[in-house]
């Protein structure tokens, strides 16, 4: 069915290649011997390292600038993510806030909540975690049975 199907290599825009070089240069200087490298994706965290990443503008980079986001593309975010993970950077401190909690606040949060939480997330100073469990499920979120009922 797929015999003979060929895909040409994707050519990334020059801006993405430049950003990749910037991230690699940052990591070469920031990932010294004091930084614990991760061998498992998202296993390690360092609040100090997250603040360094935030100072580069690489947390909340696709969010609107009115909330201290970077107004950047998802491709740029992907380039940064790929390099951080590839280098074993300790991203666990800010990962949930950047990838889950922040976007939820952008969509469902009040203006007051957005103004309060999002700038701290983008600076790498505000962290979130998610904990869910119920009987017979443990931390297997796919097996949760609880349902919300509007009252």
Residue ranges and their predicted role:
Residues 51, 81-82, 103-106, 128:
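A cross-family signal for key residues in well-ordered alpha-helices
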Residues 92-112, 138:
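N-terminal glycine-rich flavin-associated loop
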Residues 84, 108-110, 151:
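Short loop segments at secondary-structure junctions
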Residues 69-70, 89, 112-151:
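Glycine-rich, Trp-frequent "lid" loop and neighboring beta-strands that shape
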Residues 66, 97, 134:
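Residue-level "edge-of-site" marker
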Residues 1-94, 112-116, 120-123:
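Amphipathic, small/basic residue-rich leader segments at the start of a protein or domain
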Residues 7, 99-100, 127:
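Short, solvent-exposed beta-strand edge segments and adjacent coil->beta transition regions
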């Amino acid at each position: 069915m797929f015999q003979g199907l060929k895909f040409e290599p994707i050519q990334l825009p020059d801006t993405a290649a430049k950003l990749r070089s910037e991230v690699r240069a940052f990591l070469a200087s920031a990932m010294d011997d004091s930084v614990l490298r991760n061998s498992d994706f998202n296993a390690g965290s360092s609040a100090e390292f997250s603040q360094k990443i935030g100072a580069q503008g690489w947390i909340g980079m696709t969010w609107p600038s009115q909330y201290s986001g970077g107004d950047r593309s998802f491709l740029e975010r992907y380039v940064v993510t790929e390099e951080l993970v590839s280098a074993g950077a300790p991203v666990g401190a800010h990962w949930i806030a950047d990838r889950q909690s922040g976007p939820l606040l952008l969509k469902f949060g009040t203006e007051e909540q957005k103004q309060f939480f999002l700038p701290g997330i983008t600076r790498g100073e505000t962290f979130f975690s998610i904990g869910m469990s119920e009987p017979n499920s443990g931390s297997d979120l796919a097996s949760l049975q609880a349902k919300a009922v509007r009252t």
